[in-house]
Amino acid sequence: MKKEKVVLAYSGGLDTSVAIKWLMQKYSLDVITLTVDIGQGINLDEIKNKAENLGVEKAYVLDLKEEFVKDYIIPAIKSNAMYERVYPLATALSRPLIAKYLVKIAKENGAKYVAHGCTGKGNDQVRIDLGVKALAPDLEIIAPVREWNFSREEEIEYALENNIPIPVSRKSPYSIDENLWGRSIEGGILEDPWQEPPEDIYLWTRFENREPSYIEITFERGVPVELNGVRKDVVEIIEELNKIAGSYGIGRIDHIENRLVGIKSREIYEAPAAIVIIRAHEALEDMVLPRELAHYKKMLEDKYAELVYYGLWFDPFREALQAFMDKTQDRVTGKVKIKLLPWSFSIVGRESPYSLYDHGLATYDKGSTFSTESAVGFIKLFGLQNYLYALKGGNND
């Protein structure tokens, strides 16, 4: 009898390596793996070979860096997307892209199932499941880690018993997720929120530079297009900024996060490029957006980040918010100067042909063009409602 097929999102890590054998043994399925290159910086050929050696029917490896940046990271930059105003959503942004290609590969191969290695406590299970169901409601989803209830130690034992090579030891039980936009580290001592993270968990943010330096990022309609006066594609800009800012130790995040599933968790992230780009983008927006638009956009940015974090990328609400965000970027064009320091950075300059900053109006020096005479009438009209309220004794209640 012909076996049914399952397409597994495969990272080469502990959970998904064990999942290959588990899906074969538990469900008697032919396993097809999908590995996407979104800037992890790992040897994808080795991962493909590893999957094939574990007996999969096919092992797909797709370079999706350009699509990841164009369709997910750039919209997030335009939206200054930071969950709880801290986390730039590197992992969350990648999940709808993975879901999209799980569906695509499943349809191409006539697979009835898709599978992933997300845990039953995390957010990623929601993001992948919702993404798949939004695009292909008929596909069935298997989440082995959610079903088998292995502890980390039991999972390692299973791998050893089944001759599955794994990049995890009992001395280093960290779960790591990485892409162009950031790196997350979980597990082990990090689960104690009082304990300082060991220095050896950090790879992108090593403190190597002590002397201050300056960088300049040029944006066109909200998109970074130049770094230090040299035009580059966004992938290159992100890669270079991860190295440059990371060498100052910039981009570390140690955060108690409110997960979608209702628990609080201690999250460690590295995101040098994401933090610098978003802060520079915000600084440029401060210069070019009218006040009411700037203030309202800030409120919607929080909701946008929540929707992405919650796995609602394909939701009409997120898409409607994206249309708003895109419109706000019509004049977000200009240059931002950033000073890099050990462990920190500052926005120290910005310029734009659409700047609403007028030196003549803003200066307190002689030659100011601001009409102070107009201020009296403005104040009267602006405070008219409060004035009338006070006349009626409203403040005496």
Swiss-Prot record:
It comes from the Bacteria. GO terms for cellular component: cytoplasm. GO terms for molecular function: argininosuccinate synthase activity; ATP binding. It is found in: Cytoplasm. Coiled coil: none annotated. It catalyses: L-citrulline + L-aspartate + ATP = 2-(N(omega)-L-arginino)succinate + AMP + diphosphate + H(+). L-aspartate binds at T119, N123, D124. Its EC number is 6.3.4.5. One of its GO terms (biological process) is argininosuccinate metabolic process. Transmembrane segments: none annotated. Disulfide bonds: none annotated. L-citrulline binds at Y87, N123, R127, S175, S184, E257, Y269. It is an enzyme of class 6 (ligase). The keyword Ligase applies. It holds the Pfam family Arginosuc_syn_C. InterPro entries: Arginosuc_syn_C, Arginosuc_syn_N, Arginosuc_synth, Arginosuc_synth_CS, Arginosuc_synth_type_1_subfam, AS_cat/multimer_dom_body, Rossmann-like_a/b/a_fold. ATP binds at A9, Y10, S11, G12, G13, L14, D15, T16, S17, G117. Keywords: Amino-acid biosynthesis, Arginine biosynthesis, ATP-binding, Cytoplasm, Ligase, Nucleotide-binding. NCBIfam families: argG, PRK00509.1. PANTHER family: ARGININOSUCCINATE SYNTHASE. Homotetramer. Belongs to the argininosuccinate synthase family. Type 1 subfamily. This is Argininosuccinate synthase. It comes from Dictyoglomus thermophilum (strain ATCC 35947 / DSM 3960 / H-6-12).
